[in-house]
């Protein structure tokens, strides 16, 4: 998943915080979030 995190360091920090907060979320949801962010 880390490979998919592209953008500024500040943006990546925000995404990492969200991933940590959502650590209990299933993997499909995380992939969906990352895919949506990458396509934005």
From Swiss-Prot:
Miscellaneous field: Seems to bind one calcium ion with high affinity.
Single GO term (MF): calcium-dependent phospholipid binding
Family note: Belongs to the annexin family.
Keywords: Annexin, Calcium, Calcium/phospholipid-binding, Cytoplasm, Repeat
Record-given protein name: Annexin A6
Database matches in Gene3D superfamilies: Annexin
Subcellular compartments: Cytoplasm; Melanosome
Post-translational modification: The N-terminus is blocked.
Main location: cytoplasm
One GO CC term, this protein: melanosome
PROSITE patterns listed in its UniProt record: ANNEXIN_2
Organism: Oryctolagus cuniculus (Rabbit)
Annexin repeats: 1-4, 21-40
Tissue: In the lung, expressed by alveolar endothelial cells. Not expressed in tracheal endothelium or alveolar macrophages.
Record remark on domains: A pair of annexin repeats may form one binding site for calcium and phospholipid.
């Amino acid at each position: 998943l880390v490979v998919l995190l592209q953008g500024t360091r500040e943006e990546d920090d925000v995404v990492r915080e969200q991933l940590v907060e959502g650590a209990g979320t299933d993997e499909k949801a995380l992939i969906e979030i990352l895919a949506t962010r990458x396509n934005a």
